[in-house]
Amino acid sequence: MLQEIDIKSLKGKSKVVRLKIKPDSERLPIKKPNWIRIKHVASQKVEQLKKTLRSQKLFTVCEEAQCPNLSECFNHGAATFMIMGQICTRRCPFCDVAHGKPKALDVDEPKHLANTIKKMQLKYVVITSVDRDDLRDGGAQHFKTCIDNIRLSTPKVKIEILTPDFRGRIDKVLEVFKSCSPNVFNHNLETVPSLYQKVRPGANYNYSLRLLKAFKQQHPFVITKSGLMLGVGESEKQVINVLKDLRKHNVDMLTLGQYLQPSKHHLAVEAYIHPNQFDKYKKIALKLGFSQVASGPMVRSSYHADLQIKGELIS
């Protein structure tokens, strides 16, 4: 219980207090339109999955970031595992993951993760992490160790990794993954470049693009993927320019979803994007050459990732 209280104290107001561009906690939120549908499904299966994760000292980004699709995914036995702890070294104001000084890496985590995936009989897994700017390789080696353990335990499972930007350590990342690769390498740009200081402080738009391209050059047969959250102040032209940049950097798959504010202390929603606009972006993206596009208000980067890779309709 103490751990839970500590984690909560590192979220919300305390997380964003030192940001140069602070969210306005007194601002009245925009009313949610009827197309924003959050499914709350309470079931024994959801509780059992949570119990399994806690027993192995594992966490999911679904829980830590308050994903609106948590109940639906958990009820179907799907989860995006979050490695390297619950505490992030960044203060992104859109995200509800805690900020602070992280603990040392759990050397048993890769083994626990592999055992859990085998126990759950998963065929497709997504692994993400907090930012670990305190580590020399940003946590790349830990990602690799997790992949190696999963491959040994469940050889046929497909693995997607949703990575941080590793703080500009491209050479270290490429060296670590030289002899080991996931099925999908996912790194989200999150927003348009002009909004980075407000939305994604500490990150660099061009570096993220270079990371995606460099990984694709090293592993041409690995699918590369990226995503944006919309409704934080971007224009249609800016979004289309980002899509063009992603294609220029050989990114294969795309996800587009609506940003939802986790609390009044987080970044405010500037607009709720109509489903028709998401459909328009999808058509444009496919014309630009993306192999698969998931675009809709409730789409998230790892939401039904196994279906996304098959090109099945996600909205």
Swiss-Prot record:
Pathway: Protein modification; protein lipoylation via endogenous pathway; protein N(6)-(lipoyl)lysine from octanoyl-[acyl-carrier-protein]: step 2/2. Its main location: cytoplasm. [4Fe-4S] cluster 2 binds at residues 88, 92, 95. One of its GO terms (cellular component) is cytoplasm. [4Fe-4S] cluster 1 binds at residues 62, 67, 73, 302. Its cofactor is [4Fe-4S] cluster. It catalyses: [[Fe-S] cluster scaffold protein carrying a second [4Fe-4S](2+) cluster] + N(6)-octanoyl-L-lysyl-[protein] + 2 oxidized [2Fe-2S]-[ferredoxin] + 2 S-adenosyl-L-methionine + 4 H(+) = [[Fe-S] cluster scaffold protein] + N(6)-[(R)-dihydrolipoyl]-L-lysyl-[protein] + 4 Fe(3+) + 2 hydrogen sulfide + 2 5'-deoxyadenosine + 2 L-methionine + 2 reduced [2Fe-2S]-[ferredoxin]. Its EC number is 2.8.1.8. It is an enzyme of class 2 (transferase). It comes from the Bacteria. GO terms for molecular function: 4 iron, 4 sulfur cluster binding; lipoate synthase activity; metal ion binding. Pfam families: Radical_SAM. Keywords: 4Fe-4S, Cytoplasm, Iron, Iron-sulfur, Metal-binding, S-adenosyl-L-methionine, Transferase. It is found in: Cytoplasm. Binds 2 [4Fe-4S] clusters per subunit. One cluster is coordinated with 3 cysteines and an exchangeable S-adenosyl-L-methionine. Residues 74-291 form the Radical SAM core domain. Belongs to the radical SAM superfamily. Lipoyl synthase family. HAMAP family: Lipoyl_synth (MF_00206). This is Lipoyl synthase. It comes from Ruthia magnifica subsp. Calyptogena magnifica.
